[in-house]
């Protein structure tokens, strides 16, 4: 069997599957301060759009701002995003940009700011989240909330996910304002709470309670992309992956019922046995392979840089590959390829009796289903009930679910991303990504806003291991490149 390496997809999974995976125990608010005093970094004055000589200073300014931002401990839970929102509001106010802070729950805040254009084209939303996942200081070589700048890196929890990208978006706002760039579109800066937990008080709250803030927007930029830097390539970029869609979660509760009793007297309809049989059928079920447009495009593009000739052939024509048994075995043996080609099912929890000698009347399991774009949750539910084939076992969705949608590549924004990427790195590939996880972009795609995941910072595989991991850090060079990338994309689409 051909070994499918799939290293770039594994990296993408590390970067983007982290969404919604925070550990549950609430940590203490360690770190220098939950509300640090704003320090004024060296500020680059502009009378027009930046020229080459300006970018070193703008990168230094971004580094100083990110260092400060990382000192605000927004570990979720509890989040304490109000402190981050107040800090961002002060940075914006200092530049003459007013911001509104919404606090849908105590300590949980969302910040909204807008640069006005002439209204001849629809707005662009720059979306980022302020919360971060738990950092265990005993496993770090630096204080995760000190915002330390050392050895050419800015260190701290959130540097990659996603305070670094938030600073790139913030700097885009500041540069546009400072340089008095005439705009045809409003630029909306939206920093939200709660992305790592999903308790409904962040992007979901904006979409449901304040939709008029963003309803008119044509485009949204968020996390969920990847810029792959060549290892040892001195800043050379191998490819840009732009997130155009993502799988949707469809979490299910499976419940089996039977006759309770004493463990010493087995019953014929023990619900635990019934549940095990049902779950065995589910685990053995091979869901159909489905090729979505985003995956077909990305596989075809990435085939051009795939070194393994067999895998290259599969990726270059994935529709033919999924009809070939050898290709199917090879592709589905790789966890990431498998996740991108089918609806997936993971059994993640079981519960029966809390006593060894008691047969319970009910046994339950939880299943994490991820559906491809275009798949109907109700139809999938009916199919999994058919597979189980036991009327004493019920399957119910845990909560709200949705069908994932895909943002078109035939837009001014996608063309701008491609043009800027190719101007900065002419040899780099630009392609689409579908995330096996999900981001807050789905709230806005469902509002009809074309939403794209950017990974503006050129990262090697080693760099990306810090996402939700120990010693998370972002290089100063990558930060500078990301600020420039964001500004050039946004100004290309929004400037007159």
Question: Which residue stretches match the model-derived regions?
Answer:
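A common structural junction motif
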Residues: 130-131, 282-287, 385-393
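An extended, acidic, His-containing surface patch that forms the Zn2+-binding/catalytic region
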Residues: 119-121, 228-230, 288-357, 361-362, ...
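C-terminal motif of bacterial Sec signal peptides marking the signal peptidase cleavage site
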Residues: 18-20
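Bacterial N-terminal signal peptides that target proteins for export
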Residues: 1-12
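Acidic/His- and Gly-rich active-site-bordering loop/insert found
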Residues: 24-29, 36-157, 176-185, 367
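A short core secondary-structure module
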Residues: 200, 204-206, 259, 264-286
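Short amphipathic alpha-helices in soluble, non-transmembrane regions
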Residues: 269, 380-388
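Acidic/histidine-rich catalytic neighborhood of metal-dependent amide-processing enzymes
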Residues: 153-154, 160-241
């Amino acid at each position: 069997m051909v070994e499918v390496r799939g290293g770039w997809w594994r990296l993408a999974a590390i970067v983007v599957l982290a969404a919604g995976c925070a550990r549950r125990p609430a940590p203490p608010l360690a770190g220098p301060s939950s509300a640090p005093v704003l320090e004024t970094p060296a500020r680059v004055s502009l009378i027009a759009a930046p020229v080459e000589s300006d970018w070193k200073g703008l990168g230094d300014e971004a580094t100083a701002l990110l260092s400060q931002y990382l000192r605000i401990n927004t570990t979720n839970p509890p989040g304490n995003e109000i402190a981050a929102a107040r800090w961002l509001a002060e940075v914006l106010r200092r530049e003459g940009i007013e911001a509104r802070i919404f606090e849908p729950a105590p300590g949980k805040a969302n910040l909204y700011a807008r640069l006005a254009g002439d209204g001849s084209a629809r707005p662009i939303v720059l979306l980022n989240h302020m919360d971060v996942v738990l950092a265990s200081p005993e496993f770090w070589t630096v204080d995760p909330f000190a915002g330390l700048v050392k050895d050419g890196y800015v260190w701290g929890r959130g540097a990659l996910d996603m305070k670094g990208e938030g600073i790139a978006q913030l700097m885009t706002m500041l540069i546009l304002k400072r340089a008095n760039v005439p705009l045809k579109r409003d630029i909306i800066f939206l920093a939200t709470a709660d992305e790592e937990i999903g308790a409904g008080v962040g992007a979901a709250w904006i979409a449901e309670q304040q939709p008029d803030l963003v309803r008119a927007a044509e485009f949204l930029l968020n996390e969920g992309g990847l810029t792959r830097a060549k290892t040892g390539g001195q800043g050379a970029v191998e490819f840009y992956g732009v997130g155009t869609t993502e799988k949707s979660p469809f979490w299910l509760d499976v419940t089996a019922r039977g006759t309770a009793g004493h463990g010493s007297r087995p019953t014929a309809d023990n619900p635990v046995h019934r549940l095990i049989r049902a779950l065995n059928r589910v685990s053995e079920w091979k869901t159909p392979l489905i090729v979505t447009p985003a995956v077909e495009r990305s596989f075809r593009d990435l085939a051009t840089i795939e070194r393994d000739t067999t895998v290259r052939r599969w990726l270059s024509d994935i529709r033919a590959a999924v009809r070939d048994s050898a290709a199917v075995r090879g592709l589905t043996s790789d966890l990431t390829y498998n996740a991108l080609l089918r609806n997936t099912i993971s059994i993640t929890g079981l519960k029966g009796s809390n006593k060894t000698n008691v047969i319970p009347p009910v046994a339950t399991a939880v299943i994490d289903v991820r559906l491809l774009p275009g798949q109907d949750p109700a139809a999938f539910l009916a199919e999994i009930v058919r597979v189980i084939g036991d009327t004493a076992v019920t399957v119910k969705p845990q909560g709200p679910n949705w069908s994932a949608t895909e943002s078109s590549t035939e837009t001014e924004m996608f063309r701008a991303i491609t043009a800027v990427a190719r101007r900065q790195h002419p040899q780099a590939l630009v392609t689409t990504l579908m995330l096996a996880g999900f981001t807050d972009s789905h709230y806005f795609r469902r509002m009809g806003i074309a939403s794209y995941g950017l990974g503006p910072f050129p990262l090697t595989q080693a760099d990306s291991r810090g996402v939700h991991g120990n010693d998370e850090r972002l290089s100063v060079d990558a930060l500078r490149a990301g600020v420039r990338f964001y500004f050039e994309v946004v100004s290309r689409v929004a400037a007159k």
